[in-house]
Amino acid sequence: MGTPQKDVIIKSDAPDTLLLEKHADYIASYGSKKDDYEYCMSEYLRMSGIYWGLTVMDLMGQLHRMNREEILAFIKSCQHECGGISASIGHDPHLLYTLSAVQILTLYDSINVIDVNKVVEYVKGLQKEDGSFAGDIWGEIDTRFSFCAVATLALLGKLDAINVEKAIEFVLSCMNFDGGFGCRPGSESHAGQIYCCTGFLAITSQLHQVNSDLLGWWLCERQLPSGGLNGRPEKLPDVCYSWWVLASLKIIGRLHWIDREKLRNFILACQDEETGGFADRPGDMVDPFHTLFGIAGLSLLGEEQIKPVNPVFCMPEEVLQRVNVQPELVS
């Protein structure tokens, strides 16, 4: 007897319309509750949290409601002497939070708030001989960090600062027989890693190295009867994979292979009608992370109330056009 498929049941009274105003209110109020338990406990990822909040507000046309000057001052205070940027004041710098900070500054057209040359040197210093990147000085290797490195440098116009050819070699060595990618060579394919690797290959103009049909099949297999997407086989659906899977399909030109209407219904069902925001699954607690990726997923599905989102950088297309960064996509 086969393993029962893991999925959720969407109730008949689940939300089926986009509650855009409530989502904007939810994000706008989130950062003002600095004494809340949830806010205090998320300090270790604060920089990414700000990126999630600002990006979703920009996609909804509500960026003006956020405190620009406070955010810029915070980012400036998080850059270390080594050039790297930390999640919060007093924390260690990391490539992930460095990318989040650069994305925020690009949104605000304020990249001069930080020392760009030091950021470039920091990223360059994390590349290893095999082309891979560590996330920080402690040395964890992961294809996520390869993406963070090239995305950061591309936004800064400094991609030539690293050994791009070796970086490409490492990412391609993480490609699996099923067309997907893992965090290191031989690791299991996972939608989050696939997003990072296809995004990396888009930035470095190497998408011709991907078997788009094989990978597209694997990604479409992530859709469950509920319409939601999971990150790998035998897992429950999660709104965040409405981004990781869908953006990957967009990058490789296979977005039309998914059942768009069923996915849209799943995403909408994950809204909280009272507080605003999106949860991972219908009925769960909402948070800014899932709110961004729910809204960004709906943008990829063509939701007209939301600005077009770039599938590689998860930023509004208009922002990438302003800074003249246009990664290659498969048509």
Swiss-Prot record:
Highest taxon of the lineage: Eukaryota
Cofactor(s) the record lists: Zn(2+)
Amino-acid positions noted as binding Zn(2+) in the UniProt annotation, renumbered to this chain: 238, 240, 290
Nuclease in keyword set: no
Subunit annotation: Heterotrimer composed of RABGGTA, RABGGTB and CHM; within this trimer, RABGGTA and RABGGTB form the catalytic component B, while CHM (component A) mediates peptide substrate binding. The Rab GGTase dimer (RGGT) interacts with CHM (component A) prior to Rab protein binding; the association is stabilized by geranylgeranyl pyrophosphate (GGpp). The CHM:RGGT:Rab complex is destabilized by GGpp. Interaction of RABGGTB with prenylated PTP4A2 precludes its association with RABGGTA and inhibits enzyme activity. Interacts with CHODL.
PANTHER family registered for this protein in UniProt: GERANYLGERANYL TRANSFERASE TYPE BETA SUBUNIT, GERANYLGERANYL TRANSFERASE TYPE-2 SUBUNIT BETA
Name of this chain's protein: Geranylgeranyl transferase type-2 subunit beta
Species of the source: Homo sapiens (Human)
Lineage of producing organism: Eukaryota, Metazoa, Chordata, Craniata, Vertebrata
